[in-house]
């Protein structure tokens, strides 16, 4: 086999492989482009902004289909205050809209980033699971004051990825018409 034939063959293989590489890069780009952005406002919780940002970061590094960031037109707001028995909680539709209330007393007692990440989990569509271990972010305060895990576990990540796969839309409602 001549060097010329070998070179021509190598160029031919490269030309055939390049569209595959470009195609897979394009798929990654479109997947990333499909991520829904939830705009948040931390202006109502200035004392805890750094912990809120860190909690958002835990979600952003864990999931691809939704990303949270501070931007104009916020649909998710964080406020701080004393909320008594309710403590920190979220009033949300689970679709990235609502208000997260950060309680002073709980922030003094529990891991601050865990609280903000946990409450953000509600805004993304997850429910509480207080009986869960510390490794479950949505076990919340049920895991005790010694728990410092602020990252969603594999099951929580998969749930969010599934729910936000095409942007999170309202759940389907079925009715039988007669």
How would you label these PLM feature ranges?
Residues 1-27:
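Secretory targeting and sorting signals
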Residues 29, 77-101:
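Catalytic zinc-binding patch centered on the HExxH motif and its immediate surroundings
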Residues 32-44, 95-102, 140-141:
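Acidic/histidine-rich, surface-exposed loop or edge segments in extracytoplasmic proteins
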Residues 39-68:
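A short alpha-helix/helix-coil micro-patch that ends at or immediately precedes a cysteine
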Residues 59, 114-128:
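Active-site recognition of the HExxH zinc-binding catalytic motif
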Residues 63-73, 127-133, 171-175:
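Surface-exposed patches in mature extracellular/periplasmic domains of secreted proteins
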Residues 100-117:
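Short pre-active-site segment immediately N-terminal to the catalytic Zn-binding motif
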Residues 110, 123-169:
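The catalytic-center signature of Zn2+-dependent metalloproteases
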């Amino acid at each position: 086999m001549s060097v010329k034939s070998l070179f021509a063959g190598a160029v031919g293989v490269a030309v055939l492989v390049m569209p595959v590489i470009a195609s897979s890069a394009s798929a990654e780009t479109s997947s990333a482009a499909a991520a829904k952005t939830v705009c948040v406002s931390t202006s109502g919780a200035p004392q805890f902004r750094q912990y809120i940002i860190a909690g958002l970061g835990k979600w952003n590094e864990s999931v691809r289909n939704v990303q949270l960031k501070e931007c104009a037109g916020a649909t998710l707001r964080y406020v701080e205050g004393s909320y008594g028995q309710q403590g920190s909680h979220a009033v949300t539709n689970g679709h990235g809209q609502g208000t997260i209330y950060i309680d002073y007393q709980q922030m003094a007692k529990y891991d601050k980033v865990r609280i903000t990440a946990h409450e953000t989990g509600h805004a993304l569509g997850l429910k509480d699971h207080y009986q869960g271990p510390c490794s479950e972010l949505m076990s919340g305060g049920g895991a005790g004051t010694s728990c410092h895990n602020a990252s969603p576990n594999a099951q929580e990540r998969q749930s969010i990825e599934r729910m936000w796969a095409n942007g999170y839309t309202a759940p389907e409602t079925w009715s039988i018409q007669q």
